[in-house]
Amino acid sequence: MRSRLLGAAVAAATVAGLLSVGVAGAGTRAETTVTITVQGRDFSGTVDSSRPLRCAKDRKVILYKQAGTVQDPTVDKKIASDVASLSSGKYRWSTGNTGIRGRFYARAPGTPECKADSSPTIHTTS
């Protein structure tokens, strides 16, 4: 009887250990990097990740017009959005001509598997 209880305890501890490893691994979200460029008032950029098929492919990117001195997606105005698609070996997004001047940044919101990222702020000059 004692050996049965000991065997059951070892089995339970093994299962608990495996479950905790699975949960810890599942909580690790991949880094994401968003870039932005502007030509005139045409915005475009790339999305990169260590897990490109999960975190760059078909990733939604939102273009914001920055209202204050720092980026704040809860306050800044959403101007356009696009979904990154593979082109010339990189996942690229583009909004086309927005017709708006100012300071802008692109943001890929976080997902359960991927961290959020925002590009640096850029200024349109023309």
Residue ranges and their predicted role:
Residues S50-K57:
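A short beta-turn/strand-edge loop motif at beta-sheet boundaries
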Residues T74-G89:
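Solvent-exposed serine/threonine-rich low-complexity stretches and specific carbohydrate-binding patches
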Residues K60-Y64:
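Beta-strand signatures of extracellular beta-sandwich domains
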Residues Q39-G45:
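Structural beta-strand segments of beta-rich domains
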Residues T98-S126:
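Enriched for extracellular/lumenal, surface-exposed ectodomains of secreted and cell-surface proteins
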Residues M1-A26:
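Secretory targeting and sorting signals
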Residues T46, S87-N97:
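Exposed aromatic-hydrophobic patches
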Residues A26-V34:
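Cleaved targeting-peptide boundary
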